Amino acid sequence: CWDKVLNLERKNYMIKILFVCHGNICRSPMAEFVMKDLVKKAGLSDEFYIASAATSTEEIGNGVHYGTRKKLAEFGISVDGKYAVQLKKSDYAKYDYIIGMDSYNLRNMKRMLPNDTENKIHLLLDWSDNPRDIADPWYTGDFEETYNLVTAACQDWLQWIRDRQ
């Protein structure tokens, strides 16, 4: 899934990443804010635009789930001002990478954004040594496990990009 990677050396180009889950209140905002934190700490904020969205309309306008908010706060990461938004067809042209959390998200993303001719749509753990779904903590209640998987995947992905600068 690394065959379409953008060259960070091009001037004035930001890598645009959209993380996607079912409701945009647990996993995708967790990935959004973890990646923003990692990018900031690496001094690369000017080179990335990072956001998140939902495949469903169920939570649109709602804030981040308290479990995600609490877990991220443990690491000094704030999600203030984040409200659930839905994935739009126009997002395909706007983002370089559209990253889902599980196969159900992936199916819905491909339905909503047909013809992925630029190979933009992936699962977050596609970049890990053990590609798989990230379970939804809305159901599992395990925000710790979700945080660990999301953080490791975001770290690996960011390192991969930095190695190619």
What is each stretch, according to the model?
Residues C1-Y13:
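Short, Lys/Arg-enriched N-terminal segments with co-localized hydrophobic residues
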Residues W2-K4, N62, D142:
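Intrinsically disordered, low-complexity regions
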Residues N12-K94, Q159-Q165:
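Conserved active-site segments centered on acidic
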Residues Y97, S103-Q165:
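Phosphate-binding/catalytic loops
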